[in-house]
Amino acid sequence: DDCIKPYGFCSLPILKNGLCCSGACVGVCADL
């Protein structure tokens, strides 16, 4: 998926470089 671990939970969608973590995704958006 577009997320990397293990830095907590995305409580809200977080956009980074066009990718988005949903609230269910563990971690932060991948820096790709």
Swiss-Prot record:
Tissue note: Expressed by the venom duct.
GO molecular function, one term: sodium channel inhibitor activity
Keyword Secreted in annotation: yes
Highest taxon of source: Eukaryota
Main location: secreted
Leucine amide: modified positions: L32
PTM annotation (4-hydroxyproline): residues: P6
Subcellular location: Secreted
Misc. comment: Negative results: does not affect rat skeletal muscle (Nav1.4/SCN4A) and human cardiac muscle (Nav1.5/SCN5A) sodium channels.
Domain notes: The presence of a 'disulfide through disulfide knot' structurally defines this protein as a knottin. The cysteine framework is VI/VII (C-C-CC-C-C).
Protein task: Delta-conotoxins bind to site 6 of voltage-gated sodium channels and inhibit the inactivation process. This toxin inhibits sodium channel inactivation in neuronal membranes from amphibians and mammals (Nav1.2a/SCN1A, Nav1.3/SCN3A and Nav1.6/SCN8A) upon binding to receptor site 6.
Name of the protein in its database record: Delta-conotoxin EVIA
UniProt organism field: Conus ermineus
